[in-house]
UniProtKB/Swiss-Prot annotation:
Its cofactor is dipyrromethane. The modification S-(dipyrrolylmethanemethyl)cysteine is found at C237. It holds the Pfam family Porphobil_deamC. GO terms for molecular function: hydroxymethylbilane synthase activity. This is Porphobilinogen deaminase. Keywords: Porphyrin biosynthesis, Transferase. GO terms for biological process: protoporphyrinogen IX biosynthetic process. The keyword Transferase applies. The lineage of its organism: Bacteria, Bacillati, Bacillota, Clostridia, Eubacteriales.
Protein backbone atom coordinates (compact mmCIF):
# COMPACT_ATOMS: atom_id res chain seq x y z
CA UNK A 1 0.00 0.00 0.00
CA UNK A 2 1.32 3.46 -0.93
CA UNK A 3 0.31 6.69 0.82
CA UNK A 4 1.06 10.27 -0.20
CA UNK A 5 1.40 12.65 2.75
CA UNK A 6 1.22 16.37 2.00
CA UNK A 7 3.20 18.90 4.01
CA UNK A 8 4.88 22.28 3.82
CA UNK A 9 8.34 22.60 2.25
CA UNK A 10 10.21 23.77 5.36
CA UNK A 11 12.76 21.50 7.00
CA UNK A 12 10.68 21.41 10.19
CA UNK A 13 7.50 20.44 8.34
CA UNK A 14 9.33 17.65 6.50
CA UNK A 15 10.88 16.32 9.72
CA UNK A 16 7.45 16.33 11.37
CA UNK A 17 6.01 14.40 8.43
CA UNK A 18 8.85 11.87 8.67
CA UNK A 19 7.96 11.38 12.36
CA UNK A 20 4.43 10.42 11.30
CA UNK A 21 5.69 8.19 8.46
CA UNK A 22 7.95 6.35 10.94
CA UNK A 23 5.01 5.84 13.31
CA UNK A 24 2.91 4.52 10.42
CA UNK A 25 5.64 2.11 9.35
CA UNK A 26 5.84 0.70 12.88
CA UNK A 27 2.09 0.05 12.95
CA UNK A 28 1.38 -0.96 9.35
CA UNK A 29 3.19 -2.17 6.24
CA UNK A 30 2.74 1.08 4.34
CA UNK A 31 4.99 2.83 1.84
CA UNK A 32 4.76 6.62 2.15
CA UNK A 33 6.01 9.52 0.12
CA UNK A 34 5.88 13.26 0.82
CA UNK A 35 4.16 15.82 -1.36
CA UNK A 36 5.80 19.18 -0.64
CA UNK A 37 3.59 22.25 -0.94
CA UNK A 38 4.39 25.95 -0.62
CA UNK A 39 1.48 27.59 1.18
CA UNK A 40 0.34 31.23 1.14
CA UNK A 41 1.87 31.70 4.59
CA UNK A 42 5.22 30.43 3.29
CA UNK A 43 5.23 32.67 0.21
CA UNK A 44 4.58 36.02 1.89
CA UNK A 45 7.42 36.54 4.37
CA UNK A 46 7.81 40.32 4.37
CA UNK A 47 4.36 40.93 5.91
CA UNK A 48 3.19 39.87 9.39
CA UNK A 49 0.63 37.06 9.35
CA UNK A 50 -2.16 39.12 10.95
CA UNK A 51 -1.84 41.65 8.09
CA UNK A 52 -2.16 38.97 5.39
CA UNK A 53 -5.54 38.13 6.90
CA UNK A 54 -7.64 35.02 6.94
CA UNK A 55 -7.31 31.74 8.81
CA UNK A 56 -5.51 28.61 7.71
CA UNK A 57 -2.70 30.33 5.81
CA UNK A 58 -0.48 27.27 6.25
CA UNK A 59 -3.11 24.59 5.58
CA UNK A 60 -5.52 25.66 2.80
CA UNK A 61 -3.20 24.85 -0.12
CA UNK A 62 -2.49 21.46 1.43
CA UNK A 63 -6.21 20.74 1.73
CA UNK A 64 -6.58 21.53 -1.98
CA UNK A 65 -4.05 18.75 -2.72
CA UNK A 66 -6.22 16.28 -0.79
CA UNK A 67 -9.36 17.54 -2.48
CA UNK A 68 -7.71 16.97 -5.87
CA UNK A 69 -6.64 13.47 -4.70
CA UNK A 70 -2.95 14.29 -5.05
CA UNK A 71 -2.49 13.41 -1.36
CA UNK A 72 -4.09 10.91 1.02
CA UNK A 73 -3.38 12.85 4.20
CA UNK A 74 -1.55 15.87 5.57
CA UNK A 75 0.61 16.55 8.61
CA UNK A 76 0.23 19.91 10.35
CA UNK A 77 1.47 21.66 13.44
CA UNK A 78 -1.82 21.85 15.36
CA UNK A 79 -1.14 25.48 16.24
CA UNK A 80 -1.56 26.30 12.51
CA UNK A 81 -4.94 24.54 12.14
CA UNK A 82 -8.04 26.79 12.41
CA UNK A 83 -10.71 25.62 14.87
CA UNK A 84 -13.26 25.44 12.05
CA UNK A 85 -12.42 22.53 9.76
CA UNK A 86 -13.60 22.82 6.13
CA UNK A 87 -16.51 20.59 5.22
CA UNK A 88 -15.36 17.06 4.39
CA UNK A 89 -12.06 17.25 6.35
CA UNK A 90 -11.12 16.04 9.81
CA UNK A 91 -8.14 15.69 12.15
CA UNK A 92 -8.09 11.90 12.43
CA UNK A 93 -5.21 11.61 14.94
CA UNK A 94 -2.94 13.59 17.23
CA UNK A 95 0.15 11.58 18.30
CA UNK A 96 1.86 12.12 21.65
CA UNK A 97 2.69 15.76 22.16
CA UNK A 98 6.23 17.16 22.29
CA UNK A 99 7.44 19.80 24.80
CA UNK A 100 4.89 22.66 24.74
CA UNK A 101 7.13 25.41 26.11
CA UNK A 102 8.61 28.47 24.44
CA UNK A 103 12.36 28.97 24.44
CA UNK A 104 14.65 31.99 24.49
CA UNK A 105 17.75 31.97 22.29
CA UNK A 106 20.15 34.85 22.93
CA UNK A 107 23.11 36.32 21.09
CA UNK A 108 25.85 35.51 23.59
CA UNK A 109 24.08 32.98 25.81
CA UNK A 110 22.79 35.81 28.02
CA UNK A 111 19.93 34.65 30.24
CA UNK A 112 16.54 36.30 29.80
CA UNK A 113 16.69 37.74 33.33
CA UNK A 114 20.08 39.31 32.57
CA UNK A 115 19.03 41.14 29.38
CA UNK A 116 19.96 44.81 29.17
CA UNK A 117 17.24 47.43 29.48
CA UNK A 118 15.51 47.98 26.13
CA UNK A 119 16.89 44.74 24.67
CA UNK A 120 15.65 43.88 21.16
CA UNK A 121 13.74 40.59 21.05
CA UNK A 122 12.51 39.06 17.79
CA UNK A 123 9.10 37.41 17.49
CA UNK A 124 6.26 37.55 14.98
CA UNK A 125 3.74 36.23 17.53
CA UNK A 126 1.34 38.67 19.18
CA UNK A 127 0.88 36.15 22.00
CA UNK A 128 4.61 36.03 22.73
CA UNK A 129 5.05 39.79 22.32
CA UNK A 130 2.24 40.57 24.77
CA UNK A 131 3.57 38.17 27.40
CA UNK A 132 7.13 39.43 26.97
CA UNK A 133 5.85 42.94 27.68
CA UNK A 134 4.18 41.69 30.86
CA UNK A 135 7.46 40.15 31.99
CA UNK A 136 9.66 43.03 30.83
CA UNK A 137 7.82 46.23 29.75
CA UNK A 138 11.15 47.78 28.68
CA UNK A 139 11.83 45.26 25.90
CA UNK A 140 11.83 46.35 22.24
CA UNK A 141 9.84 43.72 20.31
CA UNK A 142 10.97 43.30 16.70
CA UNK A 143 8.74 41.36 14.26
CA UNK A 144 10.58 38.56 12.43
CA UNK A 145 9.33 35.78 10.16
CA UNK A 146 10.82 32.81 8.35
CA UNK A 147 11.67 29.22 9.17
CA UNK A 148 13.49 28.19 12.35
CA UNK A 149 17.01 28.47 10.88
CA UNK A 150 16.25 31.82 9.21
CA UNK A 151 14.99 33.32 12.46
CA UNK A 152 18.05 32.11 14.35
CA UNK A 153 20.30 33.71 11.71
CA UNK A 154 18.40 37.00 12.13
CA UNK A 155 19.74 37.36 15.69
CA UNK A 156 23.08 38.47 14.22
CA UNK A 157 21.81 39.90 10.92
CA UNK A 158 19.27 42.21 12.59
CA UNK A 159 21.37 42.92 15.69
CA UNK A 160 18.85 41.32 18.06
CA UNK A 161 19.53 40.41 21.67
CA UNK A 162 17.49 37.23 21.24
CA UNK A 163 14.43 35.52 19.80
CA UNK A 164 11.57 33.35 21.07
CA UNK A 165 10.84 29.98 19.42
CA UNK A 166 8.87 26.85 20.29
CA UNK A 167 10.93 24.19 22.06
CA UNK A 168 9.21 21.42 20.06
CA UNK A 169 10.37 22.76 16.70
CA UNK A 170 13.93 23.25 17.93
CA UNK A 171 14.04 19.68 19.25
CA UNK A 172 12.69 18.24 16.01
CA UNK A 173 15.39 19.89 13.90
CA UNK A 174 18.10 19.15 16.50
CA UNK A 175 18.76 22.79 17.41
CA UNK A 176 17.66 22.66 21.04
CA UNK A 177 21.31 22.93 22.12
CA UNK A 178 21.02 26.63 21.19
CA UNK A 179 18.36 27.28 23.84
CA UNK A 180 19.44 29.77 26.51
CA UNK A 181 16.28 29.67 28.65
CA UNK A 182 13.00 27.79 28.85
CA UNK A 183 9.85 29.75 29.76
CA UNK A 184 7.49 28.20 32.28
CA UNK A 185 3.99 27.66 30.83
CA UNK A 186 2.52 30.02 33.44
CA UNK A 187 4.78 32.94 32.55
CA UNK A 188 4.61 32.31 28.78
CA UNK A 189 1.35 30.49 28.01
CA UNK A 190 1.88 28.46 24.79
CA UNK A 191 -0.07 28.73 21.55
CA UNK A 192 -3.17 26.58 21.14
CA UNK A 193 -1.94 23.12 20.12
CA UNK A 194 1.75 24.02 20.45
CA UNK A 195 4.01 20.96 20.32
CA UNK A 196 1.28 18.74 18.84
CA UNK A 197 1.09 17.30 15.33
CA UNK A 198 -2.22 16.60 13.64
CA UNK A 199 -2.99 14.21 10.79
CA UNK A 200 -5.69 15.58 8.51
CA UNK A 201 -7.70 13.43 6.10
CA UNK A 202 -10.85 13.71 4.06
CA UNK A 203 -13.79 12.20 5.93
CA UNK A 204 -14.59 9.89 3.01
CA UNK A 205 -11.06 8.51 2.58
CA UNK A 206 -11.39 4.69 2.55
CA UNK A 207 -8.14 4.04 4.46
CA UNK A 208 -8.37 6.81 7.06
CA UNK A 209 -8.77 4.35 9.97
CA UNK A 210 -5.12 3.33 9.56
CA UNK A 211 -4.12 6.68 11.06
CA UNK A 212 -6.25 6.23 14.19
CA UNK A 213 -3.63 3.89 15.67
CA UNK A 214 -1.31 6.91 15.96
CA UNK A 215 -3.70 8.79 18.25
CA UNK A 216 -2.55 9.58 21.80
CA UNK A 217 -5.73 10.07 23.82
CA UNK A 218 -4.49 12.46 26.52
CA UNK A 219 -2.58 14.58 24.01
CA UNK A 220 -5.63 14.76 21.77
CA UNK A 221 -8.14 15.79 24.44
CA UNK A 222 -5.73 18.43 25.77
CA UNK A 223 -5.47 19.96 22.30
CA UNK A 224 -9.25 19.69 21.81
CA UNK A 225 -9.81 21.49 25.14
CA UNK A 226 -7.50 24.29 24.02
CA UNK A 227 -9.27 24.49 20.66
CA UNK A 228 -12.67 24.69 22.40
CA UNK A 229 -11.28 27.67 24.34
CA UNK A 230 -10.11 29.27 21.08
CA UNK A 231 -13.40 28.59 19.31
CA UNK A 232 -15.42 30.18 22.11
CA UNK A 233 -13.27 33.32 21.89
CA UNK A 234 -13.22 33.25 18.07
CA UNK A 235 -9.44 33.34 18.14
CA UNK A 236 -6.79 32.17 15.71
CA UNK A 237 -3.01 31.93 15.50
CA UNK A 238 -2.87 35.68 14.78
CA UNK A 239 -4.80 36.65 17.94
CA UNK A 240 -3.29 37.45 21.31
CA UNK A 241 -4.48 34.12 22.65
CA UNK A 242 -2.88 31.09 24.24
CA UNK A 243 -3.85 28.05 26.28
CA UNK A 244 -2.25 24.96 27.72
CA UNK A 245 -4.13 21.92 29.00
CA UNK A 246 -2.37 19.23 31.03
CA UNK A 247 -3.56 16.05 32.77
CA UNK A 248 -2.52 14.50 36.06
CA UNK A 249 -4.41 11.57 37.63
CA UNK A 250 -7.40 12.08 35.29
CA UNK A 251 -7.66 15.74 36.32
CA UNK A 252 -7.27 18.34 33.57
CA UNK A 253 -5.86 21.77 34.28
CA UNK A 254 -6.07 24.55 31.67
CA UNK A 255 -4.42 27.94 31.75
CA UNK A 256 -5.47 30.49 29.14
CA UNK A 257 -4.73 34.07 28.12
CA UNK A 258 -6.65 36.42 25.86
CA UNK A 259 -6.39 40.10 25.02
CA UNK A 260 -9.69 41.88 25.62
CA UNK A 261 -10.29 45.62 25.70
CA UNK A 262 -6.53 46.19 25.43
CA UNK A 263 -5.89 44.11 28.53
CA UNK A 264 -4.28 40.67 28.79
CA UNK A 265 -6.51 38.42 30.89
CA UNK A 266 -5.12 35.17 32.31
CA UNK A 267 -7.36 32.54 33.93
CA UNK A 268 -7.09 28.88 35.01
CA UNK A 269 -9.58 26.06 35.44
CA UNK A 270 -9.49 22.47 36.71
CA UNK A 271 -11.87 19.54 36.28
CA UNK A 272 -12.14 15.88 35.27
CA UNK A 273 -10.58 15.12 31.91
CA UNK A 274 -13.78 13.60 30.48
CA UNK A 275 -15.21 17.15 30.57
CA UNK A 276 -12.35 18.48 28.41
CA UNK A 277 -14.47 20.44 25.93
CA UNK A 278 -16.68 21.96 28.63
CA UNK A 279 -13.58 23.02 30.55
CA UNK A 280 -12.19 24.86 27.53
CA UNK A 281 -15.52 26.61 26.96
CA UNK A 282 -15.92 27.48 30.66
CA UNK A 283 -12.43 28.99 30.78
CA UNK A 284 -13.29 31.21 27.82
CA UNK A 285 -16.54 32.25 29.51
CA UNK A 286 -14.62 33.23 32.67
CA UNK A 287 -12.36 35.45 30.56
CA UNK A 288 -15.33 37.09 28.81
CA UNK A 289 -16.86 37.94 32.19
CA UNK A 290 -13.72 39.72 33.37
Amino acid sequence: MNFVIATRRSKLAQVQTEIIIDLLNKKHDIECEKLLIETVGDKILEVSLDKIGGKGLFVKDIEVAMLEQRADAAVHSMKDVPYEMPKGFEIIAIPEREDVRDAFISLDNIKFKDLRKGAKIGTSSRRRAAQLKLLRPDLDIVPIRGNVQTRIEKIKKENLDGIILAVAGLKRVNLDHLITDYFDTKEMVPAIGQGALGIEVMEEHPKKELFKDLDHYNSKICVLAERAFMRELDGDCHSTIGAYASIKDNIMHIIGIFERKNKIIKKEITGTKDQYEKLGISLAEHILKD
